[in-house]
Design a protein with these regions (language model features):
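Alpha-helical transmembrane-bundle signature of multi-pass membrane transport and export proteins
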Residues: 1-398
Length: 398
């Protein structure tokens, strides 16, 4: 487990460094505008929608550890090519988009295989704690990565950020090499579409998995409605400059770290079902705080809102992932993980488009109220489900 946690920290740090460094380099070195930055972001997002399900099948048919090794090597190779191109002065927007796509392919495979591998490394009773350690690593990388990338590019140029990201990716591979994966009995090969159908039916027909999926989709739509409106709202209505907007957004990363640190105590202090519902309820409180800025336009209130948005959902991620891993048969963990990833990523552009449409026609305030409605909906879905009354984790399926 220690090797997986350390590898995850290195891989997440490499990802966050590169995600932050690429648009900075594109603007400073290549004169990219909003359209080009949007195209780069699209290139880094498409693999999640196109390849998560194939990677889920792969993770259920072969070694999950070696899938992670291969995918992290692919991401490391894309970072190395970025580094060489930066040193040679040969970077272009087209090359950044291509390498961003390739690197994201590696990220997808790693992201699908890691939660599928974890239940084989720890007993069911230790799953929540293990997921907490993985999420703490992700939270730390998310909180520190963008600031570190910006500082490196500003002080030492683009190559410095790519050097560090490449070294971190190589470290992630080395740590995975040391990890021992218990042998699994290979399943009889079947048509891929049949296996995907079985995974989808399991999620949709399961009394615990379906509300978790619907809650996550509703949360992502509401979150990206808010994201579409927040920066212009903060600058126009709250009177914040760029630096102050950045400080309010930094509350999100701080909340993630705090939530990951406190999650074990929170889970131990209440029934497991209530611990799962805790995160969605905190999201409602967070959005209510943001809506309150319509009456009291204070940046501190917006920062507190983002802190809560980091704090509650990280507890949700830990508890809901643990529940998902516990009730899913081991042979289907890869497909189920991929389906959740695909649904969540698919909800994001829908939320962003909805937020943009509402904001353009009715203003940022309407977006805030719409986002609040979405967060209330996701809390109602999970609170009205059988998940809420779980006293503890259910038994692991055979």
């Amino acid at each position: 487990l220690r090797a997986l946690v350390a590898s995850n920290l290195a891989a997440q740090s490499a990802e966050q460094l590169s995600l932050a460094a690429v648009p900075i380099v594109a603007v400073l070195a290549l004169g990219a505008g909003p359209g080009e930055i949007g195209a780069l972001a699209t290139a880094q997002t498409l693999p999640f929608l196109l390849l998560a399900l194939p990677f889920g099948l792969w993770a259920d048919r072969s070694s999950r550890r070696w899938l992670m090794v291969g995918c992290e090597l692919l991401r490391g190779l894309s970072l190395l090519v970025m580094l060489v191109a930066a040193l040679a002065g040969q970077l272009s927007l087209e090359l950044l988009a291509l390498l961003g796509f390739i690197g994201a392919v590696g990220t997808v495979g790693y992201s699908v295989a890691a939660p599928a591998l974890l239940p084989a490394l720890v007993p069911p009773a230790a799953l929540a704690q293990a997921n907490g350690r993985l999420e703490l690593a992700r939270s730390a990388a998310f909180a520190a990565g963008p600031a570190l990338a910006g500082a490196l590019v500003a002080w030492a140029g683009a190559s410095a950020a790519f050097v560090l990201a490449t070294l971190l990716s190589a470290s992630a591979v080395a740590l995975l090499w040391r990890l021992h994966e218990p042998a699994r009995t290979p399943a009889a090969p079947r048509h891929p579409l049949v296996e995907l159908r079985d995974g989808a039916l399991l999620v949709w027909q399961h009394a615990l998995l379906r509300p978790i999926l619907l809650t996550a989709v509703a949360w992502n739509i509401a979150w990206f409605v808010l994201q579409a409106a927040y920066v212009p709202y903060a600058m126009r209505a709250l009177g914040l400059d760029a630096g102050a907007v950045g400080l309010t957004l930094a509350g999100y990363g701080a909340g993630m770290v705090a939530g990951a640190l406190l999650a074990p105590r929170l889970v131990a202090a209440m029934s497991f079902g209530r611990a799962v519902v805790f995160g969605p309820l905190v999201s409602v409180a967070a959005m209510a705080a943001m809506v309150a800025t319509l009456r009291w336009p204070q940046g501190v209130l917006a920062g507190a809102s983002f802190f809560l948005f980091g704090f509650g959902p990280i507890v949700w991620t830990i508890t809901s992932t643990t529940l998902r891993q516990t009730v899913t048969p081991g042979a289907m963990l890869g497909r189920v993980s991929a389906m959740f990833l695909t649904a969540n990523m698919g909800a994001r552009p829908l939320g962003a488009a909805l937020g943009g449409l509402v904001g353009a026609h009715w203003g940022e305030a309407a977006c805030l109220w719409l986002a609040l409605a979405g967060f209330v909906l996701q809390a109602v879905v999970i609170a009205a489900s059988p998940v809420r009354v779980l006293p503890h984790l259910p038994a692991t399926p055979a």
